[in-house]
Amino acid sequence: MVISKSPFIVLIFSLLLSFALLCSGVSAYGRKQYERDPRQQYEQCQRRCESEATEEREQEQCEQRCEREYKEQQRQQEEELQRQYQQCQGRCQEQQQGQREQQQCQRKCWEQYKEQERGEHENYHNHKKNRSEEEEGQQRNNPYYFPKRRSFQTRFRDEEGNFKILQRFAENSPPLKGINDYRLAMFEANPNTFILPHHCDAEAIYFVTNGKGTITFVTHENKESYNVQRGTVVSVPAGSTVYVVSQDNQEKLTIAVLALPVNSPGKYELFFPAGNNKPESYYGAFSYEVLETVFNTQREKLEEILEEQRGQKRQQGQQGMFRKAKPEQIRAISQQATSPRHRGGERLAINLLSQSPVYSNQNGRFFEACPEDFSQFQNMDVAVSAFKLNQGAIFVPHYNSKATFVVFVTDGYGYAQMACPHLSRQSQGSQSGRQDRREQEEESEEETFGEFQQVKAPLSPGDVFVAPAGHAVTFFASKDQPLNAVAFGLNAQNNQRIFLAGRPFFLNHKQNTNVIKFTVKASAY
């Protein structure tokens, strides 16, 4: 039997059905988008990079590819959202319904579109935040590793160079409080650049890691000036006025600086006699009366000089401690300098890489200057070292009897591995319940005595790794690139280096891979 229906009822029913199908289509699209959430795909891609990549460089390239794919998926999803929104509006206009119903339909399309767009933006910011927190957590879990991009603080920067300083060693790494008085810093100057004269309240050792230049420093007694290149090490007494010139026409001059402050432990400052911006001249802190007397100059002349500096400051803007040097200026400074000695002596500069290597074979070389043989390093009780590992080579496991070594990577990629008892105690201590803090520490030490945890860190240019005294450590280069590093041994007087695997000191991955396998839980060290 056929039942007759009112045309009006049929029309209303058709409109309601169309509107429901339209809204369900938008909702289904939303579900489809979240089912293939780019953020989830990005996280899966990152996990694959971490598990499948065998080298640090390979992992970085993989992660960059994940980032590009994620952004491309975001762009495509945004375009798809726009297309679906326009289709939704078009269907609303095509329906034969009143203006009010049509506006409700279009408003529903707009709300769905904005909700999904807002969700995608939140996902993007959340995944960036989570990634940053993950990197910070990795550094907290490895207090001996200081990655370049998170650990250095820039003190001075302009167009011609920069000066940056590593965070204090024990700032986030309590096991390193024994070396917290030392600071590591970096100068980087463009070709043909002059670094303004300055002095600092710290003993310092300058290690040239790249480029060519001239380092000059003046004390109250004499003046020392050296033409330097990669491998040159210069000891600079506290309070010496230092100025540096980058001579090369192509390469930047980079210098690693180890400083031992003489005022506040772990804190030192640079003082500039001349400057018109950042840095400022320390003469500006003195009154005209003092300057008139000291320089035997009338106040009008001093005001003229200071006003001229203020004018330069306004004209030159951000010009700072790094200035472009003229060729004749560079020649004049370099002609007055001498070359460092190859061997020990009273002079304050040597070329470490010109010495005979302490260890050497076809897989790598290791150079070292100890305070027993080089008197200029005795004040700071520091040894300076450098090593080069060929592709796939291993610096076999060893430990130092007294010295803690701060290793700075200059070129190439690789890894460091170390056996650490401190992290083993921390990991077990963090898992225990709420006990008295002192009892917890005592129990943790008793339970983990003689147990070790493996510390592993990827190494790339600019990274820093610290190997404390007594900790067995090894370094190995990636399979496709050599690994170059310089190191400062702190508390190095009468230090001995003990190799766990005997000779040879450098191996290739193919020769013997067993030497890098640490036992992370052992009954004896």
From Swiss-Prot:
Domain Cupin type-1, residue spans: 154-303, 350-513
The species is Theobroma cacao
- Report biased composition (Low complexity) as residue ranges: 424-433
Lineage of source species? Eukaryota, Viridiplantae, Streptophyta, Embryophyta, Tracheophyta
What UniProt keywords are attached to this protein's entry?
Glycoprotein, Seed storage protein, Signal, Storage protein
Q: Which InterPro entries match?
A: Cupin_1, RmlC-like_jellyroll, RmlC_Cupin_sf, Seed_Storage-Functional, Vicilin_N
Which positions are glycosylated? N130
Does the record's keyword annotation contain DNA repair? no
Tell me the GO molecular function terms. Answer: nutrient reservoir activity
* Positions of region (Disordered): 119-145, 308-345, 424-452
What protein family is recorded?
Belongs to the 7S seed storage protein family.
* SUPFAM superfamilies hit by this protein: RmlC-like cupins (SSF51182)
Gene3D superfamilies attached here? 6.10.250.890, Jelly Rolls
What's the protein here called?
A: Vicilin
Renumbered to this chain, the signal peptide range is 1-24
Q: Does the keyword Glycoprotein apply?
A: yes
Q: What PANTHER family is this protein classified in?
A: OS03G0336100 PROTEIN-RELATED, VICILIN C72
